[in-house]
């Protein structure tokens, strides 16, 4: 169901594999269509090869399950994961980003980001019960980081032990989300709660699009127009009133 792409940094691969495994617990997972030139991408920047591979699915409760792996040979590897809920379901956005350089993992973030004023109470309570390791290097959130929850973990993991701690957090966050998604029913498409969650996802996407680092890397490898298209259509597409995938 979730195919691997090209060889990755082993830690990025282990996180991606854990996410793929947990997604098997969702109901009604099916592929999402994506134009071939946006799914498997090859380019060059400064004479070095650049690969992007996208895995896109949907399921009951989620309009898009996106796993992106990218390699800028030989010095940069990226894992980008965002699970956007079907707005009819009262669910947060699951997000993971990992950046690997030759020296190790330079950045790692995981969160369940609210699309209303706060997280669902059950999810909030379960996240609060997680024992967060004392990571040596905690990073500062960007200026547009108000989209993240109070439980976000943004770090530079030091060594194999902290890598393992972070992987465990990814697993716990995602397990909480998936278990909760299977326990709730959707609201109507025209419910004010659904509309509010659509607006919350739109704000999340708008804030993420302020990340100029992503745009600059893509523009350098391809072109500014292509970078904008990729960000708008693949990474942070806006939600619409979706059909509930309720089996």
Curated annotation (Swiss-Prot):
Q: Which domain of life is it from?
A: Bacteria
What Gene Ontology terms for biological process does this UniProt record contain?
Answer: phytochromobilin biosynthetic process
Q: Where is the signal peptide?
A: none
Q: Which residues cross the membrane?
A: none
- What EC number(s) are associated with this protein in UniProt? 1.3.7.5
Q: Which reaction is the catalytic activity of this chain?
A: (2R,3Z)-phycocyanobilin + 4 oxidized [2Fe-2S]-[ferredoxin] = biliverdin IXalpha + 4 reduced [2Fe-2S]-[ferredoxin] + 4 H(+)
- Keyword S-adenosyl-L-methionine part of the UniProt annotation: no
Pfam families given in the database record: Fe_bilin_red (PF05996)
Recall the GO molecular function terms of this protein's record: cobalt ion binding; phycocyanobilin:ferredoxin oxidoreductase activity
Keywords, alphabetical: Oxidoreductase
Concerning its family, UniProt says: Belongs to the HY2 family.
Tell me, in a sentence or two, what this protein's role is. Answer: Catalyzes the four-electron reduction of biliverdin IX-alpha (2-electron reduction at both the A and D rings); the reaction proceeds via an isolatable 2-electron intermediate, 181,182-dihydrobiliverdin.
Its protein name is Phycocyanobilin:ferredoxin oxidoreductase
Q: Tell me what organism the protein belongs to.
A: Prochlorococcus marinus (strain SARG / CCMP1375 / SS120)
Lineage of origin = Bacteria, Bacillati, Cyanobacteriota, Cyanophyceae, Synechococcales
